[in-house]
């Protein structure tokens, strides 16, 4: 910002510990590591250094008068919460989050209330979409039944289940593993959607919950001729960024991502998102939809989002409609919901 041109900004994180008098930016991970107890096997000198630094950080936090919390819903985590509690003189607090008080845990929501207070300013999705700050989303749901991936199931799950049937009353864990991860019909539908997006020159992010599901989809997409890569929990930061850059530049058609992409990652603008992982958590759902809503430049400011209605099991079916209900009841999202098993109108790419 022009008015901050000559202002010194302190940085605490990424190997830096430079504190400024007025403005400082810090990562939760770095502050939390400084506030930990020193390792038991530390030498006396290292232990003394750690304790002095911890005392310095505590005094620094107590001096803060304005606390700005980015991704404030993460304050439900102990590190984030403990750091905020140490800012005892932060009478002014600005908490920024797209998912306030939406955790399944009452305790988690109360922690956010404790460190940030009630909602004072609410900016809706519709407000941002109508002004072009977010891309206009279109949602399409496909009903899918269970078609077992017999080859992979026999090779990988032979000793895990007595049978590989999925019915309406099948227990959730088994239903999810077979009906989502090892569901050949569902995975084939995901690949078809990715191919459709490629035909319309749309880069695509496919989001899963389990690493094995991402691996299976990557194998199937490569077999179909798609250029695809996969980011998961074990991927280091430089690897993640390189793969995200490949998606942004068009080097790959599809980037598959696990829950590592839900928060804290600078995701490039994408034209399409496939929600392949099921589930029902509202925070996760909104974060994943948000991966595709970054405003587009030099192209239509829209995003196509595919999800599935899993009809093979009562738990999967219930979760499907819970996800759909979130979209149906969100102004700005609801207007773009298409009939189940309908078709996208890719003509909007030219009209918009």
Locations of regions flagged by a protein language model:
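Inter-Walker segment of RecA-like/P-loop motor cores
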Residues: 2-51, 243
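Conserved helicase ATPase core of P-loop NTP-dependent helicases/translocases
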Residues: 8-20, 36, 203-205, 215-262
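Structural recognition of the conserved hydrophobic beta-strand(s) that form the central parallel beta-sheet
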Residues: 24-27, 91-98, 254-257
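Conserved Walker B
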Residues: 28, 64-67, 71-73, 261, ...
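Post-DEXD/H (motif II) to motif III coupling segment of the RecA-like Helicase ATP-binding lobe
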Residues: 65-66, 71-141, 145, 327
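A short beta-strand element within the Helicase C-terminal
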Residues: 110, 254-257, 262-278, 284, ...
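Conserved interdomain hinge at the start of the Helicase C-terminal
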Residues: 159-222
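Conserved segment of the helicase C-terminal RecA-like domain
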Residues: 291-324
């Amino acid at each position: 910002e022009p008015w901050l041109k000559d202002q010194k900004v302190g940085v605490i994180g990424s190997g830096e510990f430079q504190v400024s008098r007025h403005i400082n930016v810090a990562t939760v991970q770095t502050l939390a590591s400084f506030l930990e107890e020193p390792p038991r096997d530390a030498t006396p000198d290292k232990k003394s250094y750690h304790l002095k630094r911890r005392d310095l950080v505590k005094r620094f936090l107590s001096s803060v008068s304005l606390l700005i919390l980015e991704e404030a819903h993460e304050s439900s985590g102990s590190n984030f919460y403990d750091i905020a509690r140490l800012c005892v003189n932060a009478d002014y607090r600005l908490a920024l989050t797209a998912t306030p008080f939406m955790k399944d845990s009452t305790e988690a929501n109360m922690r956010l209330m404790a460190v940030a207070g009630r909602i004072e300013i609410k900016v809706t999705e519709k407000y941002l979409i109508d002004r072009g700050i977010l891309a206009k989303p279109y949602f399409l749901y496909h009903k899918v039944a269970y078609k077992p991936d017999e080859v992979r199931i026999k090779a990988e799950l032979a000793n895990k289940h007595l049978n590989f049937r999925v019915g309406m009353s099948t227990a959730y864990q088994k239903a999810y593993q077979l009906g989502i991860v090892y569901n050949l019909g569902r995975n084939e539908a995901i690949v078809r959607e990715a191919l459709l997006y490629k035909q319309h020159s749309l880069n695509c992010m496919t989001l899963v919950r389990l690493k094995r599901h991402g691996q299976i989809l990557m194998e199937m997409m490569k077999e179909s001729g798609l250029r695809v890569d996969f980011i998961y929990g074990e991927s280091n930061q430089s690897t993640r960024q390189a793969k995200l850059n490949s998606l942004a530049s068009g080097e790959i058609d599809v980037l598959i991502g696990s829950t590592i992409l839900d928060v804290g990652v600078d995701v490039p603008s994408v034209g399409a998102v496939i929600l392949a992982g099921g589930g029902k958590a509202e925070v996760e759902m909104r974060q994943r939809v948000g991966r595709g809503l970054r405003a587009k430049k030099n192209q239509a400011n829209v995003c196509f989002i595919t999800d599935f209605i899993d009809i093979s099991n009562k738990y999967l079916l219930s979760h499907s409609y819970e996800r759909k209900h979130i979209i149906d009841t969100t102004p700005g999202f609801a207007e773009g919901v298409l009939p189940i098993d309908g078709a996208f109108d890719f003509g909007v790419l030219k009209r918009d």
